[in-house]
């Protein structure tokens, strides 16, 4: 592809689907804090005045689902009834049951190293050297815009903003390299008192300009700030929210393939989550080692079976060493069994609530973002 455009979108922590994701992961974290070996599959539904938390959990822990839910909604910023959703007064329904013993017998083994996958499925991981965090630029800057929206809202700098927001950034590429930004969309919920011109000016000056690199902005860049002109009704009052509905926002913004499995609310025995994190870890280390400019990893699993049923490595013609060397390096240096994923990436810890908004990848605080295998891979491949 010579010249082309590519677009990704993100949503804020106050988007209904992201409220649901954060509640599911807050419940997961609270359980893992007491019982790291718990089996958790937690789903959340939110709508005006109501949160329903359901799923399957097997654990020795006890957690206060209602209080976790209210505190999560409170932290996001829905604390007044005039927003259509209030952490202090919304109904919280709990319909959590136990995990099926039929699933359990396939996962739990006498030898922990032979722990089986919690389900069948396919997972993808991706990395590219087009940004310093080895992530695609469109999703990276889409996340940063809505993160900035939350920052200026919570600090009171733009006190007329409300929690719900969406962003979208279109990048221009030439021969695979970024040459500019073609379009920026940012829609943010707001209180009724602010005028559209004032809001648009404030968003441009306090959110967009501080986030997007000026060298990529030209006179031809299009900006669409609250293009409908009004966004007062938002959050769960505007749309219902469900866990697991923002899987492309959570990953690579469409720049890589997706196996279809969502992440939030799932403990690390669920390979939908842990293997997707591991695939990112592998792809990122391959790119960090200089073995390729872009790398996509596919993994697949069978329920109750420890070893992956397949491993695929795609480098899109950007590899700097033989494809066979890359595949051998993956097999030799990465333990991709469920137990191996949990141990290498230290996944049995309560770190998941913070993943549930602004993307699971490209954030250095998470263990799957480490490039600690890069030097080993360079030596193996003979890269100087």
Swiss-Prot record:
The keyword Metal-binding applies. Binds 2 divalent ions per subunit. Binds 1 potassium ion per subunit. It comes from Vibrio campbellii (strain ATCC BAA-1116). One of its GO terms (molecular function) is methionine adenosyltransferase activity. Its cofactor is Mg(2+); K(+). Residues 99-109 are annotated as: Flexible loop. It is an enzyme of class 2 (transferase). This is S-adenosylmethionine synthase. Coiled coil: none annotated.
């Amino acid at each position: 592809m010579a010249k082309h455009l590519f677009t990704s979108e993100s949503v804020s922590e106050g988007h209904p689907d992201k409220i649901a994701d954060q509640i599911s992961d807050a419940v997961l974290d609270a359980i893992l804090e007491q019982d790291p070996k718990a089996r958790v599959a937690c789903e959340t539904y939110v709508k005006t005045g109501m949160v329903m938390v359901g799923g399957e959990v097997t654990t020795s822990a006890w957690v206060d689902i209602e209080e976790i839910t209210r505190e999560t909604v409170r932290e996001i910023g829905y604390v007044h009834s005039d927003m259509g959703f209030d952490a202090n007064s919304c109904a919280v329904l709990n319909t959590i049951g136990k995990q099926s013993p039929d699933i359990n017998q396939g996962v739990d083994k006498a030898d922990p190293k032979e722990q089986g996958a919690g389900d069948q499925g396919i997972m993808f991981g991706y990395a590219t050297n087009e940004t310093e965090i080895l992530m695609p630029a469109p999703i990276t800057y889409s996340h940063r815009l809505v993160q900035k929206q939350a920052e200026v809202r919570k600090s009171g700098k733009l006190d007329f903003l409300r929690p719900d927001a969406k962003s979208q950034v279109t990048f221009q590429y030439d021969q695979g390299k970024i040459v500019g930004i073609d379009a920026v969309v940012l829609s943010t919920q707001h209180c009724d008192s602010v005028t559209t011109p004032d809001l648009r000016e404030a968003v441009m000056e306090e959110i967009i300009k501080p986030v997007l690199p000026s060298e990529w902005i030209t006179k031809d860049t299009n900006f669409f700030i609250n293009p409908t002109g009004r966004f007062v009704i938002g959050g769960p009052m505007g749309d219902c929210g469900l866990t697991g509905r923002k899987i492309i926002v959570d990953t690579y913004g469409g720049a890589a393939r997706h196996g279809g499995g969502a992440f939030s609310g799932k403990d690390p025995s669920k390979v939908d989550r842990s293997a997707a994190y591991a695939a990112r870890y592998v792809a990122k280390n391959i790119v960090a080692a200089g073995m390729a400019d872009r790398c996509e990893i596919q993994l697949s699993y069978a329920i109750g079976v420890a070893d992956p049923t397949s491993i695929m490595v795609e480098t899109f013609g950007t590899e700097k060493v033989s494809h066979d060397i890359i595949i051998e390096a993956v097999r030799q240096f990465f333990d991709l069994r469920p137990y191996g994923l949990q141990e290498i990436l230290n996944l049995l810890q309560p770190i998941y609530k913070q993943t549930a908004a602004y993307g699971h990848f490209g954030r250095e605080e998470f263990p799957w973002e480490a490039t600690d295998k890069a030097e080993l891979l360079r030596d193996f491949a003979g890269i100087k």
